[in-house]
């Protein structure tokens, strides 16, 4: 029994059917309490914006939260730099995900812009079920590999056996 090995490549295209908005809020304040309360206020504003356009406040999910001390380098009178405490940085990373709808996306972005929370914003257009796309890609690659194997077998005067 002779064996040949072939590699298949696959191609799949999928139209985006899902939108993920990533929102980052960072507050820097001299005190921990002030940083936390200002961040909480900005989160409440974002939740209110989400509710105004038809979502529940729970739909705005926190993906990460951290508090760090910040320092800055300051030049003293002798020209030497030294680190000075700048405050506490409270950072929230949130996401809001929903089925693809460009009109709804425009409403959400407008509500966020109008709420005064001033988050950093990024928009990802993706597919809701990436496993289905991966499955289609594997099928395409397998069909490509089988076609290559059939061509090699025909050219060499052999029959394709079990796969």
Label each residue range with its predicted role.
Residues 1-163:
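Short, charged, surface-exposed interaction patches
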């Amino acid at each position: 029994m002779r064996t040949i090995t072939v590699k298949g490549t696959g191609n799949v295209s999928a139209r985006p059917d899902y939108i993920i908005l990533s929102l980052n809020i960072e507050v820097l304040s001299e005190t921990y309490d002030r940083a936390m309360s200002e961040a909480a206020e900005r989160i409440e504003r974002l939740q209110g914006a989400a509710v105004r356009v038809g979502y529940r406040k729970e739909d705005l999910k926190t993906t990460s939260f951290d508090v760090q001390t910040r320092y800055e380098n300051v030049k003293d009178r002798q020209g030497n730099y030294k680190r000075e405490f700048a405050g506490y940085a409270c950072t929230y990373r949130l996401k809001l995900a929903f089925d693809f709808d460009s009109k709804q996306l425009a409403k959400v972005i407008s509500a966020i812009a109008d709420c005064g929370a001033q988050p950093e914003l990024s928009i990802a257009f993706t597919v809701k079920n990436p496993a289905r796309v991966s499955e289609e890609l594997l099928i395409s690659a397998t069909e490509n590999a089988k076609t290559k194997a059939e061509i090699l077998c025909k050219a060499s005067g052999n029959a394709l056996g079990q796969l």
